[in-house]
């Protein structure tokens, strides 16, 4: 039921020298639901400036206000694995299907259903099931994507990992990742993806 209650909650964290990725397998109902369920976190360095140091998406729930990236709903299924987080949003028909995302400031290549970025020495590939709108804010890139059974897959890679795959800059990383786009099920209830570490995720 997504309420959490007294049941045990399980978290997943993957740490590298460049970033951390992870999330909560289960959602816990908490006061105001201010916590997001998963994220990729970059190191706090002077290079970031005033930018946020996290990348995450969620479906807004009760208490959400425009521009305030908190207060998620209970409609999310996630699979974190190493530097990848996959999330599906099975939102009921009577609710707004828009999911919102927060990305760190950096250099971004925007495509119809994907964004490829470089922020604080970390490459990020962001794939969405539906098209999106992205707006630059003072400290972040705000993303909105609407459509039934939305989904997102994010993979992070450090500079050395990307270079080992012959991606020497953001353009090279984007070229590498374009051909690795996840396959979302026609009904939106599943997704498959092969990570940069050749792990098949479904």
Question: What are the language-model segments listed below?
Answer:
Residues 2-202:
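Ser/Thr/Asn(+Pro)-rich, low-complexity disordered segments
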């Amino acid at each position: 039921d997504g309420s959490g209650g007294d049941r045990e909650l399980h978290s997943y964290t993957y740490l590298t020298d460049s970033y951390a990725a992870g999330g909560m397998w289960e959602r816990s109902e908490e006061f105001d639901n201010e916590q997001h369920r998963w994220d990729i976190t970059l190191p706090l360095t002077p290079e970031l400036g005033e930018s946020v140091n996290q990348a995450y998406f969620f479906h807004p729930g009760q208490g959400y206000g425009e521009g305030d990236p908190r207060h998620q709903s209970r409609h999310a299924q996630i699979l974190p694995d190493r530097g990848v987080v996959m999330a599906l949003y099975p939102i009921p028909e009577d609710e707004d299907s828009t999911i919102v995302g927060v990305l760190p400031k950096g250099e971004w290549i925007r495509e119809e259903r994907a964004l490829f970025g470089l922020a604080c020495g970390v490459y990020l590939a962001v794939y969405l099931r539906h098209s999106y709108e992205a707006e630059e804010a003072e400290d972040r890139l705000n993303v909105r994507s609407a459509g039934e059974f939305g989904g997102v897959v994010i993979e992070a890679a450090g500079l050395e990992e990307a270079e080992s795959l012959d991606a020497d800059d953001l353009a090279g990383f984007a070229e590498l990742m374009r051909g690795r786009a996840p396959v979302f099920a026609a009904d939106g209830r599943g997704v498959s993806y092969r990570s940069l570490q050749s792990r098949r995720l479904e």
